[in-house]
């Protein structure tokens, strides 16, 4: 019996998107879903109760950051991440690989792992597949990720080929080092950049190892959206139908819908809380920057079509005032709204799949949001 089980419910006849449910040791969640990111064992400014109120069934935490602060041994002593942060629903932890490759100025990759510098104090550190498993086993997440190499975009075919081969060898080492397969599901990560041949090789290698789920990595790293969609189109069919598929680091509304249409079940991104901190809000009518002067006397909600706590209780003028005065409550209100917006969007996506009309929903949403305009603004 594995810790993670995927239950397939139906396919959208119009698009091929999947409706499903993922079962974990800490409850189940419906898919496609968006996972709020709690990098340091907290979704910035949000309480667990607030996340539950917006119906979040799973959140993400970060292995690299929790290894550095407070240290995985302290989290283990606390009884694991769920107890430490008072969250009784599912948690996914990433492997730390992305942070090693994106945050550290110095890094040296070798077969054993990666030498790099701590981005906080410059200390030399070493992270290997075995260490990534040790940390995640101590954290006790429901879903943990294999340690992979995260090449930048663009990368040459030759470099990417070596990287994919190394990632496959590291994935095998992760499986061997994983000490808690009965209560923690380990996902493999398909790499290969924009190269179909390498994505095929990576998927073939990882599927042969029979992971309980699969992530599609190396996207949302600077490539244009049409390349991301093309890669998804040839990658998701390579993955088993009876396992969850997770697209890492994607959180803009258009990409969530386009990813679901291409067979993705799970998404995560810091985007909704990061942009909330500078007053940028996702609304049913497009991007809204609440700090703008034109909202100083606007006493309507951030989004007239939203029923979240923020929109039911506070005006654009009030939230603008809080943001201009650097009041933390303003960030809480915009963060709550953006997270609610994406979680609610995914519920709308699931409903559209149930009704076999996700293609129509995409057209309506893109038209209303303004994604169809030639100068459409993203986040």
Swiss-Prot record:
* Cofactor(s) it depends on: Zn(2+)
InterPro entries linked to this entry: ArchSynthase1/Queuine_TRR, TGT, TGT-like_sf, tRNA_ribo_trans-like
- The enzyme's first-digit EC class, named in words, is transferase
Q: What does this protein do?
A: Catalyzes the base-exchange of a guanine (G) residue with the queuine precursor 7-aminomethyl-7-deazaguanine (PreQ1) at position 34 (anticodon wobble position) in tRNAs with GU(N) anticodons (tRNA-Asp, -Asn, -His and -Tyr). Catalysis occurs through a double-displacement mechanism. The nucleophile active site attacks the C1' of nucleotide 34 to detach the guanine base from the RNA, forming a covalent enzyme-RNA intermediate. The proton acceptor active site deprotonates the incoming PreQ1, allowing a nucleophilic attack on the C1' of the ribose to form the product.
Task: Give the record's subunit note.
Answer: Homodimer. Within each dimer, one monomer is responsible for RNA recognition and catalysis, while the other monomer binds to the replacement base PreQ1.
Q: Which NCBIfam families match?
A: Q_tRNA_tgt, tgt_general
Family from the record: Belongs to the queuine tRNA-ribosyltransferase family.
Q: What is this protein called?
A: Queuine tRNA-ribosyltransferase
Question: Source species, please?
Answer: Bacillus mycoides (strain KBAB4)
């Amino acid at each position: 019996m594995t810790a993670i089980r995927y239950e397939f419910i139906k396919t959208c006849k119009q698009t091929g998107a999947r409706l499903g449910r993922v079962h974990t040791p800490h409850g189940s969640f419906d898919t496609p879903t968006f996972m709020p990111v709690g990098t340091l064992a907290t979704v910035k400014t949000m309480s667990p109760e607030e996340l539950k109120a917006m119906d979040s069934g799973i959140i993400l935490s970060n292995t690299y950051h929790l290894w550095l602060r407070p240290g995985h041994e302290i989290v283990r002593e606390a009884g694991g991440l769920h107890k430490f942060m008072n969250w009784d629903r599912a948690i996914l932890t990433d492997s730390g690989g992305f942070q090693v490759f994106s945050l550290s100025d110095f890094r040296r990759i070798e077969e054993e792992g990666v030498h790099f510098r701590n981005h906080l104090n410059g200390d030399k550190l070493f992270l290997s597949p075995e260490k990534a498993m040790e940390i995640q086993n101590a954290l006790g997440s429901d879903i943990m990720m294999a340690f992979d190499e995260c090449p930048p975009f663009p990368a040459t075919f030759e470099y990417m080929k070596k990287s994919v081969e190394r990632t496959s060898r590291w994935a095998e080492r992760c499986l061997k080092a994983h000490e808690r397969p009965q209560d923690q599901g380990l996902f493999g990560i398909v790499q290969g950049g924009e190269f179909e041949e390498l994505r095929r090789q990576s998927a073939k290698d990882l599927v042969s190892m029979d992971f309980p789920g699969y992530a599609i990595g190396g996207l949302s790293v600077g490539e244009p959206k049409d390349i991301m969609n093309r890669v998804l189109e040839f990658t998701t069919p390579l993955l088993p139908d009876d396992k969850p598929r997770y697209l890492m680091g994607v959180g803009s509304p258009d990409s969530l819908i386009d990813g679901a249409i291409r067979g993705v079940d799970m998404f995560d991104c810091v985007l909704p809380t990061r942009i909330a901190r500078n007053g940028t809000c996702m609304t049913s009518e497009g991007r809204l920057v609440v700090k703008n002067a034109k909202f100083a006397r606007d006493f309507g909600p951030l989004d007239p079509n939203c029923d979240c706590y923020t929109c039911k209780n506070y005006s654009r003028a009030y939230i603008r005032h809080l943001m201009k005065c650097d009041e933390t409550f303003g960030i809480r209100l915009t963060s709550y709204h953006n997270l609610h917006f994406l979680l609610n969007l995914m519920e709308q996506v699931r409903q559209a799949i149930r009704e076999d009309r996700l293609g129509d929903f995409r057209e309506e949403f893109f038209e209303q949001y303004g994604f169809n305009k030639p100068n459409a603004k993203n986040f």
